[in-house]
Regions:
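Generic structural signal for alpha-helix termini and adjacent loop/cap motifs
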Residues: 58, 91-92, 177-181
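Short, surface-exposed alpha-helical segments at coil->helix boundaries
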Residues: 16-19, 49, 110, 149
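A conserved pocket-lining segment of Rossmann-fold NAD(P)-dependent short-chain dehydrogenase/reductase
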Residues: 54-76, 84
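Conserved loop-to-helix N-cap of the C-terminal "lid" that shapes the substrate pocket in Rossmann-like
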Residues: 32, 67, 74-82, 98, ...
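Conserved beta-loop-beta element that borders a ligand/cofactor-binding pocket
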Residues: 18-42
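Conserved Rossmann-fold NAD(P)-dependent oxidoreductase catalytic core, especially the SDR/UDP-sugar
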Residues: 1-16, 24
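Mid/C-terminal beta-alpha module of Rossmann-like enzyme folds, strongest
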Residues: 84-147, 152-154, 158, 172, ...
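Glycine-rich "substrate-gating" loop/helix at the edge of Rossmann-like oxidoreductase active sites
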Residues: 9, 36-46, 66-79, 103-105
Length: 204
């Protein structure tokens, strides 16, 4: 899905190489911003949609593979990320510095989805399964045992950055946008409830 949306993303994509090239050029004044997974209104990946659809469809249980449930990665709400970029761009102190932009703390995928579900007043339960027992359409590529955890302490302490929108409100706004702007095309295999029910039937 990432490559379908971002066609420039391939196996040669490497941001670190770009950072090193910029830092190695004494003629170029630089500041490096490391951005998170950005969510919110306008998200081309519709990150909230699979959970919202299952809840709306009346699913009482939502499955996560064990490795994905525990995975942690940096997230940021679109307005907060834009504000952080503006703070850096207008600061004389930012030259020659590297800043991570992300929410604090970095929640596990299970904790994150639980916060979204709570905002939706969904009263079902999350069921965490070993990867080998998880339906194939729910498995994510990559190595979920490798967390991607960043700290935004530097931009907060050095430049005084603060989130403009608190996390509960960011989730509420994103849910509202997703409900009003569902994806134009759905992959039915992504919502194979028969396979999910079969996996649930084998849970002790």
């Amino acid at each position: 899905m990432l490559q379908n949306t971002f066609t420039w993303l391939d196996e040669h994509y490497d941001k670190i190489a770009v950072e090193e090239a910029i830092q190695g050029d004494p003629a170029v004044p630089w500041t490096i911003l490391r951005l998170p997974m950005v969510y919110g209104p306008g998200d081309p990946l519709h990150r909230f949609f699979p959970l919202l659809k299952r809840a709306t469809d009346g699913r009482s249980s939502i499955l996560l593979s064990e490795d994905l449930a525990g995975w942690r990665g940096p997230r940021g709400y679109v307005e907060n990320v834009a504000h952080a970029i503006a703070v850096v761009a207008t600061s004389d102190q930012a030259a020659g510095r590297i800043y991570n932009i992300c929410e604090e703390p970095s929640l596990s995928e299970l904790a994150w989805q639980s916060k979204i579900a709570k905002q939706m007043n969904w009263h079902g339960k999350f069921v965490v399964l070993p990867r080998g027992q998880t339906p194939k359409h729910l498995l994510q590529p990559g190595n979920a045992a490798q967390h991607v955890v960043a700290s935004s302490e530097r931009i907060r302490t050095e430049l005084g950055y603060e989130d403009l929108v608190e996390i509960e409100e960011t989730i509420r706004r994103t849910i509202a946008w997703e409900q009003q702007n569902p994806p134009s095309a759905l992959n039915p295999q992504q919502f194979d409830y028969g396979a999910e029910d079969a996996a649930l039937a084998n849970v002790p």
